[in-house]
Amino acid sequence: CDKFYTVREDGLSQNWGGQVVFCNPPYSRRTKKNPGQEDWIEKCCSESENNKITAVMLIPARTDTKSQHDYIFAHAKYICFVKGRLKFNDGADPAPFPSEIVVFTQQDFDEKIKGLSDLGFWIKLRE
């Protein structure tokens, strides 16, 4: 990436306008001290709709959550339920949960998505 935000820069408070964003947020839930995954999902949705950016998220597939229904199912254009479990540390430690790739965008990426079919099951949620 040409530009990235760490905890120090507080990516949630930055304007992402004009960017293509990859977001792999903390998987934790919101606390009084720290934003949670739902805050990042809301930010990606908002930036896509208000600033016309493309945001690609890699997050746990939590289809039962409010943010999944209110933001992802309601506003994302594409979602991929990743095949298998992501593996970390040279494949020795698979994630204890399924993952999904969520794309918030105003653009059409149908052809590019076809080339990523080996990652899992892709769904186009809206035109």
Predicted regions mapped to residue ranges:
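Class I S-adenosyl-L-methionine-dependent methyltransferase catalytic core
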Residues: C1-E127
